[in-house]
From Swiss-Prot:
NDH-1 is composed of 14 different subunits. Subunits NuoB, C, D, E, F, and G constitute the peripheral sector of the complex. It is found in: Cell inner membrane. This is NADH-quinone oxidoreductase subunit D. Keywords: Cell inner membrane, Cell membrane, Membrane, NAD, Quinone, Translocase, Transport, Ubiquinone. Signal peptide: none annotated. GO terms for cellular component: plasma membrane. It is an enzyme of class 7 (translocase). It comes from Helicobacter hepaticus (strain ATCC 51449 / 3B1). It is a peripheral membrane protein.
């Protein structure tokens, strides 16, 4: 018998786009331009208000943690670029730091200066990318264009150092692959002068813009207790008055020797988080200027020395038999860290990024677990979106600054 489908009973299994009451089920994504990746939100709306939100993730899942268990430690390093691909060096560094704690090597001072400088350049790239994308999501297209000019300068710096603009592979276990190229510090110094001018321009266009304020203020409010319950970190926590930055409170690399502040806000809304992204860029510029002054007086070594785990300098590999054999073994068979486990947290541009590594003395990790901030920040949407209007989703989603490379691992 032929069925007759009416407006209230469409021919879609288990999906009712229009119902007899005012409620509606709507799919946001997984290919929506404001989704910041492969995000699908299953929304239940009552008129224009969200009464239920269910994030559906996994569209970008690649099994990265399992891949690590089948790769030697150095082989896995380029794969970490594919987590937060907006600030790839932060992933390289977090993994390298975890392995270094496991094998117990000391990093040369110059390598620490270079690594910290690259991390802060990446932080600026990530934050300024967020400002541009948030502006575009809310309707301020010109902000996107101004911010991407500065982002291009930052990517040019990374390209000058490692040859890559997005997936950098710029860190090595035990140090860095290269010293800074000729005139690199001069280019970085120009970058530190141009970024504040762009930020002043952005703030001049947005801070007193009535539409911008209406779209962000009192939208996406997160209280301190709510942030703690959901294990939020980075600006998502600091925007709610939680003064916690791993660089300051559990310092690594050179951060304990550097002068910088941890800006916080108490309002907890999208506008407060927007302000913090800008303030953090200023603090990163302050750190970079200190590192520029510190670099010339450092010894020239850029890699730790431990024949069990780290290859000799290339000059020795080319001229000494023992160094060549050691290098061959490390490349083909891999290092063998001692039995043990370690968890090392770092402050990535998105929040707390940590690697848990369990070693059984083999060339590959027995278990590797990655604690990524975006995973927690996307989960919070199932409560954060409730009560907001559908039009608020792009503004709220942008302020979380999630990237799906580190959510779908």
């Amino acid at each position: 018998m032929k069925q007759n489908y009416t407006k209230l009973k469409p021919n879609f299994e288990n999906i009712f786009f229009e119902q007899e009451n005012d409620k509606m089920i709507l799919n946001f994504g997984p290919q929506h331009p404001s989704a910041h990746g492969q995000l699908r939100l299953i929304l239940e709306l009552e008129n224009e208000k969200i009464i239920k939100a269910t994030p559906d993730i996994g569209y970008l899942h690649r099994g990265i943690e399992k891949m690590a268990e089948n790769m030697i430690y150095n082989e896995f390093m380029p794969t970490t670029d594919r987590l937060d691909y907006i600030a790839a060096t932060s992933n390289n560094y977090a993994f390298a730091l975890g392995v270094e704690k496991l094998i117990g090597v000391d990093i040369p001072l110059r390598a620490q200066v270079i690594r910290t400088m690259l991390l802060e350049i990446n932080r600026i790239i990530s934050h300024i990318f967020l400002l541009g994308v948030q502006g575009m999501d809310v309707g301020a297209l010109s902000i996107f264009l101004y911010c991407f000019i500065e982002r291009e300068y930052g990517l040019d710096l990374m390209e000058d150092y490692c040859g890559a603009r997005l997936t950098h592979n710029a860190i090595r276990i035990g140090g860095v692959p290269l010293d800074l190229p000729h005139n690199f510090l001069e280019s970085v110094e120009k970058f530190t002068h141009s970024v504040p001018k762009t930020l002043d321009l952005v703030r001049g266009l947005l801070d007193k813009n009535r539409i911008w304020r209406i779209r962000l203020e009192n939208v996406g409010y997160i209280s301190q207790d709510f942030a703690k319950q959901w294990s939020l970190s980075g600006i998502m926590a600091r925007g709610s008055g939680i003064k916690w930055d791993i660089r300051k409170h559990n310092p690594y690399e050179l951060y304990s020797e550097l002068d910088f502040e941890v800006p916080i806000a108490t309002e907890g809304d999208c506008y407060a988080r927007y302000q913090l992204y800008i303030e953090e860029i200023y603090e990163s510029l302050k750190i970079i200027k200190q590192l520029i002054a510190m670099y010339p007086s450092t010894p020239k070594e850029i890699m730790a020395k431990d024949a069990r785990y780290i290859s000799a300098p290339k000059e020795d590999i080319m001229t000494q038999n023992y160094s060549l054999m050691q290098h061959f073994v490390l490349v083909t068979q891999g290092m063998r860290p001692p039995v043990g486990e370690v968890y090392v947290p770092t402050e990535s541009p998105k929040g707390e990024l940590g690697f848990f590594i369990n070693s059984q003395g083999a060339p590959s990790p027995h278990r590797l677990k990655i604690r990524t901030p975006s995973f927690y920040h996307i989960g919070v949407l199932q409560e954060l979106l409730i009560g907001h209007y559908f039009a608020d989703i792009p503004a709220i989603l942008a302020s979380t600054n999630v990237v799906f490379g580190e959510i779908d691992r």
